[in-house]
Design a protein with these regions (language model features):
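Flexible, acidic/Gly-rich N-terminal and inter-domain linker regions that tether
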Residues: 4-90
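Glycine-rich S-adenosyl-L-methionine
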Residues: 206-209
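Cell-envelope and extracellular/periplasmic
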Residues: 195
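Conserved Radical SAM active-site core
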Residues: 57-190, 198
């Protein structure tokens, strides 16, 4: 069931572009492209997806397939992120897309992260506008792995900051330093979801590089 504010958001924006030029990609020989967003460093030929399922080689360029594609939109207590000492007692606007660069067998959001859920297009500025309209002090990128939708998260986080909305990132932390450092000035709080305690387990169980 959609709440009135969710219907309003989806009705206003409807469908939009399904491809967006990806950042942190390197063109290689024979039309292949190498992604430098996360440690997988996927090298893909024309029409092939990265391991995250959200980035693809299209005409010799890496594109983001989930830019603005919101699959889950909700209003949560900030403690559900879970954050205990950041703006306690407040609600946060939570948004997620699809795709993940890990493959944990115990993922509670597997249908979102690795499936093909229905989505609606919401431009980056739409998230800040919705948070302000609903009088919610923060915006959370959650549900799936936000880093595999880096371009939209980056744009939405910047516009949220400009609107005075706090930004929360719920992530597995599996990202390269350069893109993370570029995003951090627009992030107010972060929950890095620890999946395992050893590199071996990350590789053999969680699908890390």
């Amino acid at each position: 069931r959609l709440y009135k504010w969710q219907k309003m958001c989806y009705t206003i924006y409807g469908s939009g572009d399904t491809m967006h030029e990806a950042m942190y990609a390197e063109e290689m020989e024979n039309g292949a492209v190498k992604c430098r967003l996360c440690p997988h460093h996927c090298v893909r030929r024309e029409g092939k997806l990265g391991l995250c399922g959200a980035r693809m080689n299209h005409d010799g360029h890496f594109v983001s397939l989930n830019y603005g594609r919101v699959t889950s939109l909700g209003m949560d207590p900030v403690e559900k992120k879970p954050l205990r000492r950041f703006m306690p007692g407040t609600m946060t606007l939570s948004a997620g897309s699809f795709g993940c660069n890990l493959a944990c067998p115990y993922c509670q959001n597997h249908a979102i992260a690795h499936g093909s859920p229905e989505s609606q297009y919401v431009p980056p500025q739409g998230m800040a506008r919705l948070a302000v309209k609903q009088d919610v002090p923060s915006l959370s990128f959650t549900y799936n792995e936000p880093m595999v939708g880096y371009e939209w998260v980056y744009d939405a986080a910047r516009t949220a900051k400009e609107a005075g909305v706090k930004v929360i990132l719920v992530t597995n932390g599996y990202v390269e330093r350069e893109p993370l450092a570029r995003l951090l000035p627009y992030v107010d709080a972060m929950n890095i979801d620890l999946k395992a305690f050893t590199e071996e387990t990350y590789r053999t169980v969680c699908g890390g590089a």
